[in-house]
């Protein structure tokens, strides 16, 4: 009974309690994290805990199951990694924790944080995701790492086919971006995983939004959980300047080029709705001399990580992405987000624009609205509860770009066509093993071949 009372009081006092705690609690040590891990936080430059960490860590250390409602960039990886490492120090054990994530990039990112936090205590992680050779993963699992970070599909694969690998001794399960794991139709995989891990475990479920599917999963997977919410209902950050542009769809490319010129010197993340459009737009911009790189589900794993690292290292200032990339990726500096294709789910708008104006910096988000997108745009405005202003443009200046853009579009189409033919030939020779986010066995090789020649000229 006492536990449920504590739970209720937490729920009811949620907002004021957080405020008080933020005032009082200044360090990870105050939250109950052991000294070794506090030092690791210092080395990573984590001077003080974020809101979600202040709420979740003490409860996790008490052994409670947790539902964390927090957006990307809120420090939620630390909120589950620190309690898990803390517990691992107390009772060292192999195959101690499993973290499920929707995408491979996020899995690698979480693994990096675990390894950085646990470097002084020798924590070993294995990342088990699609698009990477199964055999080497089986070998990594045979060494029985402490932490397994996986996408559900590939993990099931190993649970069924890798001899000697099981999770029967597992102590912690984390589902990060649970809403997205479920939206990507991994429900059956998650159910299978829940069946083969111990009932007697601690479970942390993190999600940016509380959907019906997430509530159902919560009932199936968590015992008497405590809710830690830090994001209020779908708000977008105050320092974010949001605009829209109403334009005929045939002029989208031209307006994009105009905006990139107008706001030159900033880093951009441009969202497209399909892999194909991401690729086409990247080629178009490269033909016009912009340093643009694509990131989407049809690229092989190594290419995706390569793209991401170039952008992170500021070697490229424009990243074009599908929604694959829009959530959970730790991309530190984006000054401007452009919704080149409006998101079909209004909640995705929140996640996309969440790439900018992070950690107290300001940022811009510009959404292109064509004659076909009006209803979707109204839904977005309704969701965030504000009317967006128009981004100011000089239409005569925009129209002066038309000729150059049309020429670049022609080149981009030709390159895509050539690339498509090359791909057909190579697919007959080679089977493809990409399995994340609907990659339909298509590998993008645009970065090679013709593009390189073009630069050399």
Swiss-Prot record:
Its EC number is 3.6.4.13. SMART domains: DEXDc (SM00487), HELICc (SM00490). This is Probable ATP-dependent RNA helicase DDX47. It is an enzyme of class 3 (hydrolase). Its main location: nucleus. One of its GO terms (biological process) is mRNA processing. GO terms for molecular function: ATP binding; ATP hydrolysis activity; RNA binding; RNA helicase activity. CDD domains: DEADc_DDX47, SF2_C_DEAD. It comes from Bos taurus (Bovine). InterPro entries: DDX47/Rrp3_DEADc, DEAD/DEAH_box_helicase_dom, DEAD_box_RNA_helicase, Helicase_ATP-bd, Helicase_C-like, P-loop_NTPase, RNA-helicase_DEAD-box_CS, RNA_helicase_DEAD_Q_motif. It catalyses: ATP + H2O = ADP + phosphate + H(+). The keyword Membrane does not apply. It comes from the Eukaryota. Gene3D superfamilies: P-loop containing nucleotide triphosphate hydrolases. Residues 415-430 have a biased composition (Basic and acidic residues). Residues 239-399 form the Helicase C-terminal domain. Residues 415-457 are annotated as: Disordered. The modification Phosphothreonine is found at residue 151.
């Amino acid at each position: 009974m006492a536990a449920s009372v504590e739970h209720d009081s937490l729920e009811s006092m949620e907002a004021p309690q957080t405020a008080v705690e933020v005032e009082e609690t200044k360090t990870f040590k105050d939250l109950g994290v052991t000294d070794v891990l506090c030092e690791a936080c210092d080395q990573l430059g984590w001077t003080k805990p974020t809101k979600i960490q202040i709420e979740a860590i003490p409860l996790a250390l008490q052994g409670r199951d947790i539902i964390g409602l927090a957006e990307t960039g809120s420090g939620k990886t630390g909120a589950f990694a620190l309690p898990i490492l803390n517990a691992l120090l107390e009772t060292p054990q192999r195959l101690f924790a499993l973290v499920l994530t929707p995408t491979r990039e996020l899995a690698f990112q979480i693994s990096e944080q675990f390894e950085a936090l646990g470097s002084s205590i020798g924590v070993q992680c294995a990342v088990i995701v699609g698009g990477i050779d199964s055999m080497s993963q089986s070998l990594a699992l045979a060494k029985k790492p402490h932490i397994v970070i996986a996408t559900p599909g590939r993990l099931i694969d190993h649970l069924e086919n890798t001899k000697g690998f099981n999770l029967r001794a597992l102590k912690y399960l984390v589902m990060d971006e649970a809403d997205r794991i479920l939206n990507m139709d991994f429900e059956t995989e998650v159910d299978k995983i829940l069946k083969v891990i111990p009932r007697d475990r601690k479970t942390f479920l993190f999600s940016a939004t509380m959907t019906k599917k997430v509530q159902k999963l919560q009932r199936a997977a968590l015992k008497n959980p405590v809710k830690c919410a830090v994001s209020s209902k779908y708000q977008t950050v105050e320092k974010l300047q949001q605009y829209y542009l109403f334009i005929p769809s045939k002029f989208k490319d031209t307006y994009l080029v105009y905006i990139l010129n107008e706001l030159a010197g900033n880093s951009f993340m441009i969202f497209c709705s399909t892999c194909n459009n991401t690729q086409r737009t990247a080629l178009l911009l490269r033909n016009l001399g912009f340093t643009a790189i694509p990131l989407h589900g049809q690229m092989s794993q190594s290419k995706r990580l390569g793209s991401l690292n170039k952008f992170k290292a500021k070697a490229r200032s424009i990243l074009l992405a599908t929604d694959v990339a829009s959530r959970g990726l730790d991309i530190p500096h984006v000054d401007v987000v452009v919704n080149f294709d409006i998101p079909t789910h209004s909640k995705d708008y929140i996640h996309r624009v969440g790439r900018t104006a992070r950690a107290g910096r300001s940022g811009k988000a510009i959404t292109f609205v064509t004659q076909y997108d009006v209803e979707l745009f109204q839904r977005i405005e309704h969701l965030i509860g504000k009317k967006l202003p128009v981004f100011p443009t000089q239409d005569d200046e925009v129209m002066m770009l038309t000729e150059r853009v049309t020429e670049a579009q022609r080149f981009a189409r030709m390159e895509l066509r050539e690339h498509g033919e090359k791909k057909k030939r190579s697919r007959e020779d080679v089977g493809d093993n990409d399995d994340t986010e609907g990659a339909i066995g298509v590998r993008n090789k645009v970065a090679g071949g013709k593009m390189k020649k073009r630069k050399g000229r």
